[in-house]
Amino acid sequence: MTYTRNHDPNFFEECQSFANCGSFAFNVEEWYSPDEYFEDDMGQTIEQWIDRCVWNGWDVYDMSNEFAGILVNYILNDFDDVRYLIWEGEIQPDEELIAFRTFVDTEGDWDFHFKVFRDGLWLEKCGSDPVRFCEENDWNNGLIEYIIQTIYFARKLES
C-alpha cells in the first residue's frame, strides 16, 4: 500500500479521528497499522499465530517480542525513508526518532504503539485522541503495558 505523506502542520490537531499513533509517527494521513496485512512465515493470521504460540507454551514477553520483529519488517517495507536503529544514538540530524513497542497476550489480544521524539520532546497519539506529551519510558496506558524493550526507527525528515 502507498501512504499519503502529510504536509499540513495542523493536520493532527484538525483530523484526530483519521489518524493514530502510526499515522503520527510516520507522518501519513491514513490510519497506519503495520499489522493490517499480517501473515507470518507459515501464512497464518494474527489470531492463528497467537493460538500456535500459546499452544507451544510461549509467554507474553516472547510473543510480544516475536510480534514486534514481524511488524518491524512490515514497517521497513512500507516506508522507504525509515530505517531500523540498533540504538537510539544512531539518529542523524536530518532524521526523527520513533520509538515502538508491541503487546500480545495469551487471550488473543494484541496492540502496538509508537512515540516520536520531536523538537526535544517525546510525543504520542493514542488512537483517535489528540497528540500529547509523554515520557520515553512510560509504556503503560492504563489498559496495556507494553513490556518489551523499545525498538527504535529513524524517519528521514522532509526538506
Label each region the model flagged.
Residues 4-5, 80-82, 131-135:
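Short amphipathic alpha-helical surface micro-motifs
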Residues 13-32, 39, 43-45, 64-68, ...:
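Active-site nucleophilic cysteine motif
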Residues 121-159:
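Active-site or metal-binding loop neighborhoods of secreted/extracellular toxin and effector enzymes
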Residues 44-129:
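...with weaker cross-activation on analogous glycine-rich loops/strands in unrelated enzymes
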Residues 1-15:
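Active-site-adjacent structural segments surrounding the nucleophilic cysteine of cysteine proteases
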